[in-house]
């Protein structure tokens, strides 16, 4: 350091005067270029505000990742650039040149060069880190657990940049005055050394960015990661929920970020953890052991993490490319001797522009779907059916909730990857009503298949008298028992099917309509007429068949086909604009029917084994809203619960405002408790509808034993509704 200071004090004159005459041809240091000064001042102010904003925003993040911390260090580089350019502007002010101006020129040039090297090296480091985490089966912890390592890497980059920038103080090269500030002497061989360092960083960044660009920005299908079925069953937490609430998996189209990721081997990958196609299972398991408390795939944190990788890739390429003209100009001037002051000034302004783009990274927290579909022409809805009507192979978790010619399906699926198209049942064609089947009915015990399929159909619902013949297209896959933490095995069976016996006229009328927050038109009430006035419903009509209250949200039939231990319940909730605070809106909810059908115990079942059944529940919900603004806050929550009343599995809510599914926590209640007031205060009905598989098993057993004498709780509820309807008509 003493050597640097001595050289800085004794050699300032030579460092500056060596090439002084070459820089005052058109714009001497004492002449002020008002246009350049004003433009530099504006860009410097923008860089100052942006760097402070991005630094504060990134440091205030609750779940900081390695990517966000590295970008935060970028903001520090931007502040360093602001300081150096501020000195440049001071040097441009017309005045006599005192001795300390030489010191300022050397200091500002050193800082300018140091932040440039640091920014470019960190860009390469960021892209390398993203490439490593996306193509290796290695888990990476959040920055909060590796803050020391991240800080060490950042300090190392800064130290290396400072060392390389300070070489002119040791006698190799010199800093000279320019019309816009100060820069290294381009006639020195030191410029070639800098260009080699930049070229290596640039080449590595471009080489790694090519596969990442396709993976993060231009892939037709976002990367996806299989979470273990048992992990999903335990539930998960989301931002805004207490730590003790468990862990929630959000299963939404946006939350699945890329096509080539594999199952994590039953772990909870971190927000930066993904597994590439070539990663062995052992590597994934080892990564899980290193990080048992990471962020689950599909959660909001995981989605933001993938968005951060997208924005970091774009910013890294932007910063390095904006420095390219300056480096090329320096090399050309060194090799050929050609010097163009306008080109040099323009190159300087581009490097200054590179310091103003860092705040764009903060957008990754909210705009998780960008830049796909916006900056890059990506296929935003990778779950829609191809226009040519061909079947699209689907794998892993799949979701689709749409209105297309009065027909829409929402699916949840979980399976291992199948390479054979004909063995994959997870495709969806909205234009026909063919059954989705699997052609491999019996698989070896080494193959694992766990599937949950939820269908939300907006086609006309069937009366209770016709429900028995619904499940006509059914195939069953025998699954392998998976070993749990207690080394006990549960056999899961999956029964898939759907309400597909609908008239063709259902699919030939009306244009395509999709649930989207961009749609400002209100639903045509005539489209919903079929959903009212059924035998087990309370009609919501006035005279003239007009709704008493405007209809909003969603109404239809929900069908669940699940392995043993799962059933489905559906309810509606009011959600805040941020999509995190969930408040039950009990006054706006009316459940008309929740009836389990197709509950058939296994014929080979014995009292000593766990009952293996396939439960199918139809739950119809009609929500009545008092105001039109509720359209932006209404969500549909499908809750899949286990037989245990103490364990709740993930729940999904569909937000019309956000146009996607997100996860939520509904608490530990395992049943609906409905209070039905009647005209007689003593005759009020309070019914508890079970929401567990075990309760449905008991109901099914009693129904087979007692035959006509037994009624489920939901049947009592329907009876109460009819009684209330008769009382209202009588009055």
Swiss-Prot record:
GO terms for biological process: antral ovarian follicle growth; negative regulation of ovulation; neuropeptide signaling pathway; preantral ovarian follicle growth. Residues 1-35, 91-109, 177-189, 332-342 are extracellular. Residues 57-69, 133-155, 211-310, 364-731 are cytoplasmic. It comes from the Eukaryota. InterPro entries: GPCR_Rhodpsn_7TM (IPR017452). Glycans are attached at residues 7, 11, 21. The keyword Transmembrane helix applies. It is found in: Cell membrane. Residues 479-497, 510-526 have a biased composition (Basic and acidic residues). The chain crosses the membrane at residues 36-56, 70-90, 110-132, 156-176, 190-210, 311-331, 343-363. Residues 234-271, 475-526 are annotated as: Disordered. Disulfide bonds join 105-182. CDD domains: 7tmA_GPR149 (cd15011). Orphan receptor. Belongs to the G-protein coupled receptor 1 family. This is Probable G-protein coupled receptor 149. It comes from Homo sapiens (Human).
């Amino acid at each position: 350091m003493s050597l640097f200071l001595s050289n800085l004090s004794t050699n300032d004159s030579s460092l500056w005067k060596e090439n002084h005459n070459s820089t005052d041809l058109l714009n001497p240091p004492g002449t002020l270029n008002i246009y350049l000064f004003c433009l530099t001042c504006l860009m410097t102010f923008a860089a100052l505000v942006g760097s402070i904003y991005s630094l504060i925003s990134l440091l205030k993040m609750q779940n900081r990742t390695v990517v966000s911390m590295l970008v935060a260090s970028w903001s520090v580089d931007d502040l360093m650039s602001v300081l150096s350019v501020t000195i440049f502007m001071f040097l441009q002010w017309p005045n006599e040149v005192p001795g300390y101006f030489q010191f300022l020129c050397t200091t500002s040039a050193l800082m300018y060069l140091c932040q440039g090297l640091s920014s470019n090296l960190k860009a390469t480091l960021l892209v390398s880190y993203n490439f490593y985490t996306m193509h290796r089966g290695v888990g990476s912890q959040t920055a909060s657990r590796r803050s020391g390592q991240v800080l060490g890497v950042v300090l190392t980059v800064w130290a290396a940049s400072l060392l390389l920038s300070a070489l002119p103080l040791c006698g190799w090269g010199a800093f000279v005055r320019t019309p816009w500030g100060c820069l290294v002497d381009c006639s020195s061989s030191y410029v070639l050394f800098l260009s080699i360092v930049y070229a290596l960083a640039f080449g590595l960044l471009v080489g790694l960015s090519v596969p990442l660009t396709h993976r993060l920005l231009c892939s037709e299908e976002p990367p996806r990661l299989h979470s273990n079925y048992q992990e999903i069953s335990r539930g998960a937490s989301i931002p805004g929920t207490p730590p003790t609430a468990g862990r929630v998996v959000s299963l939404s189209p946006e939350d699945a970020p890329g096509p080539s990721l594999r199952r994590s081997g039953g772990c909870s990958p971190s927000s930066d953890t993904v597994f590439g196609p070539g990663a062995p299972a052992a590597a994934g398991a080892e990564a899980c052991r290193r990080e048992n408390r990471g962020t689950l795939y599909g959660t909001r944190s995981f989605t933001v993490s993938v968005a951060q990788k997208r924005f970091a890739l774009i910013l890294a390429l932007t910063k390095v490319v904006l420095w390219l003209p300056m480096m090329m100009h320096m090399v050309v001037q060194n090799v050929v001797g050609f010097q163009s002051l306008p080109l040099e000034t323009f190159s300087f302004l581009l490097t200054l522009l590179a310091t103003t783009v860092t705040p764009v990274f903060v957008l990754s927290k909210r705009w998780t779907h960008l830049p796909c579909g916006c900056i890059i022409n990506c296929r935003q809805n990778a779950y829609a059916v191809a226009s040519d009507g061909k079947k699209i192979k689907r794998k892993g978790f799949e979701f689709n909730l749409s209105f297309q010619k009065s027909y829409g399906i929402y699916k949840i699926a979980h399976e291992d990857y199948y390479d054979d198209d004909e063995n994959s049942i997870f495709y969806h064609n909205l234009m026909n009503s063919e059954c989705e089947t699997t052609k491999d009915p019996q698989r070896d015990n080494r193959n694992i298949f766990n599937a949950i399929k939820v269908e939300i159909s907006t086609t006309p619902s069937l009366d209770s008298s016709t429900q028995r013949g619904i499940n006509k297209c059914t195939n069953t896959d025998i699954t392998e028992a998976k070993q749990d933490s207690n080394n006990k095995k549960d056999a899961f069976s999956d029964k898939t099917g759907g309400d597909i016996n609908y008239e063709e006229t259902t699919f030939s009328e009306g244009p395509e309509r999709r649930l989207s927050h961009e749609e400002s038109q209100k639903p045509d009430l005539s489209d919903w007429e079929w959903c009212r006035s059924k035998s087990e419903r309370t009609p919501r009509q006035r005279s003239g068949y007009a709704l008493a209250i405007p209809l909003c949200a969603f109404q239809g039939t929900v069908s669940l086909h699940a392995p043993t231990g799962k059933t489905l319940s559906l309810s509606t909730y009011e959600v805040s604009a941020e999509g995190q605070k969930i408040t039950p809106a009990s006054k706006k909810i009316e459940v008309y029917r929740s009836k389990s059908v197709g509950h058939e115990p296994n014929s080979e079942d014995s009292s000593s084994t766990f009952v293996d059944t396939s439960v199918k529940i139809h739950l119809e919900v009609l929500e009545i809203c008092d105001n039109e603004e509720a359209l932006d806050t209404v969500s549909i929550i499908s809750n899949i619960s286990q037989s245990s009343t103490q364990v709740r599995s993930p729940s999904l809510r569909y937000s019309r405002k956000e146009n996607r599914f997100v996860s939520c926590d509904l608490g530990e209640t395992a049943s609906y408790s409905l209070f039905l007031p009647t005209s007689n205060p003593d005759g009020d009905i309070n019914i508890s509808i079970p929401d567990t598989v075990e309760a449905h098993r008991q109901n099914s057993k009693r129904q087979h034993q007692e035959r006509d004498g037994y009624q489920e709780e939901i049947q009592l509820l329907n009876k109460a509704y009819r009684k209330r309807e008769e009382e209202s008509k009588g009055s």
